[in-house]
């Protein structure tokens, strides 16, 4: 215990070193902040009428205490360019309206939108958005941007999202994680990458989203059924990965990010450069790339064999924007080679029993960056072309085309190691037309149509067949706002045609009919259904609002759920599909009470209930499947009526000027109504508390800015809401509850005009050995032990 305490004290002392230098230094004034020129920050936004949402032309926006003033243009936009990081006081005024004020610290380009009230109305709160302008959704949503997002650098997308309430991840060892929203994941969660629906082999629990988190300036999660806007399958929610808009002011800037992680000796280098040429102001472009390498991960007591990975990612964007129209293009490539924990691939029934009983996995391993078999090689390309045309003062037509190509190669520990045992290739073409119609009184909305073509093929041993699908959709969403009320309604129709191709020998247990093994089968499925949403928000005052949403969504079974028959490489299981599966239909109800933008207390509580008819789930079969390659754990697809009920709570309280306390909790219960029992593999209860100490300026002339240190504790309960006779469904009981002590610290070092942002994160500081219920490899090994992450970000301006 003394050793653990010494480690913790040493970490806290290292993070607090700057505090001893100049605790009494005062923060900068706005005037001091803007005295440095060419710092490169752009502050912009729109000024509108709060009730009618019409733009206010000629509104004055002043940075109080500085000579900077901006007047809104014909679209209600204002701009400030080349600002330095610091605290600014914005004052917005317009004849006949009550002025608005906002004091805020800005460290990066932001969009701040103001909604002014006529003089007869009370002063309202200011809406702040760190990305594109958006309406407040009637569903619960969470955002991650700015410094909080930067603190997640080096983590996967799923790990970054765990900072939000209601989100967790399902893991397959230490290197693969998929996001979970309110107990649902994979095909029930849509990921929108730069406005394009991410399409890959997402049916696999070990198929993490092929997205580089460094491309995002904001991550947004819409919780609950969201099928109207984003299409069928969005039963659990939607994850929006949003890059920042292309630069709209003349100049060139760049950023270099460096990350090091201790538990797997991971190193990350990521860079971005963007420009808006002064000679061609309508043109903007951006280049971005990331290199990542990690070796075997270490638990408190041993290394996990063959758990290293490598990534090489690249993206490029360019846009041409005029007052009435604009076009832009985006291309990204994600490539990774990642090892699959060798202890999960066993050879016979005795190996399975021994693996479940032993405390340490076999084979024993040391640290290495080498990646052996089994491993996966994954490449994902995305090409997006987008154009818009303004159809009036507030209307806009969007046209989008996207092509995605995903190749997944899986190399086995058995057989020919020079070629993949299985190669998947899936190609997707997606088009969408969206019209945001002009304001009609207090009504604003959008209409759209989409079409998607998809083709999947494979080489090697059979697991999922060839298939071809056509999907089309029509949607209409309207929003009415007046005074304290915000009402939203939407309707969508989707149609899907699916045809698979396979030989009878690959599906004998599901066809129910005799025939020659080499007979080609082409089963066809047609699905069509409606999705709808109805929501409302009522503002009680500047800080308090209540939102309610009722929505329905649906999901057709995937090809893997219908026809899988083989070894699922990443999980080391033999999976059987079910050709008799029907369509899932979800009815989601959610209410959110939020108290926000208060100087001392802020909080939010969301309660939800999601009824899902014909819920498709995978259940382990305790009888392993024997193959010529060995014995494998077995899983089968089943269907039942289910109910998901839960609550998300988050709150923060400013104890003093510098010290804040925050807490959050997420609870979800998933019940099989058909069998009158709980469902398996559902997230357990999670509770997290933190104390955060901040100090704006330290050192001579504020050398250290935005200083903070945070200590937090995460408690995860044992999953006790499980079916009776659990060991008839799974190979081991849910693991014990656990507590993790974590810490973070950060500062921004000011070296003349050059800034260097430094962050230090410690996870599992007590080096606790534990296993997580949602890790598919919990049968074989512990989770990662103590891990220290050092992050350095260097912005550059030219």
Language-model-derived ranges and their functions:
Residues 8, 613-614, 661, 715-724, ...:
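C-terminal beta-signal and adjacent terminal beta-strands/loops
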Residues 81, 196-223:
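Short acidic/polar hinge/loop motifs at secondary-structure boundaries
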Residues 111-115, 157-160, 177-180, 192, ...:
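N-terminal periplasmic accessory domains that precede
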Residues 419-434, 576-582, 588, 595, ...:
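Outer membrane beta-barrel strand-and-loop segments of large Gram-negative receptors
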Residues 27-38, 46-51, 59-64, 93-97, ...:
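Short, acidic, small-residue-rich periplasmic hinge/interaction motif at the N-terminus
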Residues 258, 287, 397-412, 545-551, ...:
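Membrane-embedded beta-barrel scaffold of Gram-negative outer-membrane proteins
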Residues 608-612, 629-719:
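Gram-negative outer-membrane beta-barrel transporters
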Residues 240, 276-372, 509:
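Periplasmic-side early beta-strands and strand-to-turn transitions of outer-membrane beta-barrels
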